[in-house]
Amino acid sequence: MRILVFDTETTGLPKERNPSIYKTEQWPHVIQLSYVVYDSELNEVVVLVNDYINIAFNTQISKESQEVHKITREMLNEGITINEALHKFNEYSKHCDLVVGHNVSFDKRMIIVEGVRNKIKIRFW
């Protein structure tokens, strides 16, 4: 069995409680996407990824979020595009049987929102 353990860090929280994933303007942006794919039958890590996302200069990061994750604009400037990160995530996640994470419902929605925002179909089981 392949297990995906993933986490996101974002620019903040949604502007309203439980907005539609299609109201992307209500949602923050993903600035870090980290995940591990583990094969339980082989007892090995298939891949370990920690991508910082190079967001637009005018995209604000809330002070509260920055205090939690400590991600700086300089770190993001060295990052990859959200498109690259999502395509890579899709490639690895499509072979997984189980998804695990802390606050995984929020993280799943964040990935889906970024997919909607960037016109990329996200594969979630």
Where are the model-predicted features located?
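Conserved non-catalytic scaffold segment of RNase H-like nuclease domains
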Residues: 1-117, 123-124
